[in-house]
Amino acid sequence: MAIHLYKTSTPSTRNGAVDSQVKSNPRNNLIYGQHHCGKGRNARGIITARHRGGGHKRLYRKIDFRRNAKDIYGRIVTIEYDPNRNAYICLIHYGDGEKRYILHPRGAIIGDTIVSGTEVPIKMGNALPLTDMPLGTAIHNIEITLGKGGQLARAAGAVAKLIAKEGKSATLKLPSGEVRLISKNCSATVGQVGNVGVNQKSLGRAGSKCWLGKRPVVRGVVMNPVDHPHGGGEGRAPIGRKKPVTPWGYPALGRRTRKRKKYSETLILRRRSK
């Protein structure tokens, strides 16, 4: 990824750093429009997810998370920008004439070949079941339910590690630090998701954030008491509480928000680290 640094000619471009290499030219048969209504609002128009709204119109790219074209070699033709995720995507031309998008593996270049199946080589971009992978393999786009497609480790730079196999289950260490069990028959893609330097980018101004559909974030301490528990006071006043709270009065730091009776509770060996 090539990071382009702006010259400090105006305040809006000062400290700006964007990716200037990957462009977007999607295929018409692999995109479709989405109807986004509300953008953070519920059916009554009330805000349920803050800091969302506006943004440029998007076309959704059909991504092949299942990788079910077994034993058919494909060639990477393009590496494109996807407005719906922070990872890049690759256009694959398969030997049977089919064309699909997949997540861009780190280090993959135009012209590389990939394949998915049960007895394929352990090579970056290839997809195969966990039972056929050696221990210590770096993987991404991991299935939770067999045949449903990859659901874990899909963000830019995400990578998980296969650390054990016992019985019908495989033990994975996820990017969050969580260690959990998954069926050995589930598939995953070898390697790490590309665009590792996504955190190095700096948009430089609030208007660029608005193009992405992200509205400004206002601190509660500068609000009025009617708007936030931290609000009010004369001048720069403290929050007036022992610990910070959310706009609805719940503890903001340290409180666990995961439901206790989830089906996957028995599959998690170690909860994610902070």
UniProtKB/Swiss-Prot annotation:
Its main location: plastid. Keywords: Chloroplast, Plastid, Ribonucleoprotein, Ribosomal protein. It comes from the Eukaryota. GO terms for biological process: mitochondrial translation. InterPro entries: NA-bd_OB-fold, Rib_uL2_dom2, Ribosomal_uL2, Ribosomal_uL2_bac/org-type, Ribosomal_uL2_C, Ribosomal_uL2_CS, Ribosomal_uL2_dom3, Ribosomal_uL2_RNA-bd_dom. It is found in: Plastid, Chloroplast. GO terms for molecular function: rRNA binding; structural constituent of ribosome; transferase activity. Signal peptide: none annotated. Part of the 50S ribosomal subunit. This is Large ribosomal subunit protein uL2cz/uL2cy. It comes from Nasturtium officinale. The gene is rpl2-A.
